[in-house]
Amino acid sequence: MRIKVRAPATIANFGPGFDVFGMAIDKPFDEVVVEEFNEFEIISSGYPVPNGEDNIALFSAKTLFKMLNIEGGLRIKLKKGIRPKSGLGSSGASAVAGALGAAKLLGVSNDELILKAAMKGEEKASGEPHPDNVVPSYYGGFTVIESKSPLRVHFVDAKLRGVVVLPEVEIPTAKARKILPSMVPLKDAVKNIAMASSLILALKEGDLETIGRLLDDNLALPYRKKLMPWFDEIRRVALETGAYGITVSGSGPALFAIGENLKDIGKTIVEKFEELGIKAEYWVTKTGRGAKT
């Protein structure tokens, strides 16, 4: 029996929703082919990732076996389509693909259990079980995390098109979290609450200009910009080119912008990066479906 699973990249935080908002996008994605085997084995292609015990897809699959007290094994062939350390939920997608592939092989359909195994994989990769990547990659669409334990998720019916720009810069999630303060000024917290609440309404109404204006953040971005000294200049160029707004995806360096002329916006940002001596690529994307077999 062979199972094929695709798990999409995600835009986590989505502006003011730090550790809460996340949206699946239609590309890129990680793909696994899972089959029965007498031990646990991983074969990977695409972007380079660890093999063996440190592979997140394999770790998540093994975690599900342990949770179910099932002995045995499986072989995973991973086609890594999401660049690691990109800010696009690379480890979360691998975790979802591995856990869901194992679940399908075992005939398990318990969403909560599968997500728990995937979040263990995400925790191994980044030090914390981030549901704002794992959950939208699993379910698709735009998700809001009410709580991690117990896991409570809300869904927003949002259909967006945007442009992702990915510079050739790596920002490990653990490093991006370490730079954050343990406390922030009250006025910054209040501002984020206002923006996040308004963003949900704008998403429901499909108000692109308002959504763009609200793609901002006072909790993490002011501190993480130290790891992205080019951000303010890139943001200025994007807005001048017609973007309604631009934000950092996850912990970066990937950027997500919305507007009308998405190809022009992406091309202009890439050209600006090249002026700064940084290679970059862009692609137009949209709200995506969740992991599927």
UniProtKB/Swiss-Prot annotation:
It is found in: Cytoplasm. This is Homoserine kinase. The keyword Kinase applies. It comes from the Archaea. Its EC number is 2.7.1.39. GO terms for molecular function: ATP binding; homoserine kinase activity. Gene3D superfamilies: 3.30.230.10, GHMP kinase, C-terminal domain (3.30.70.890).
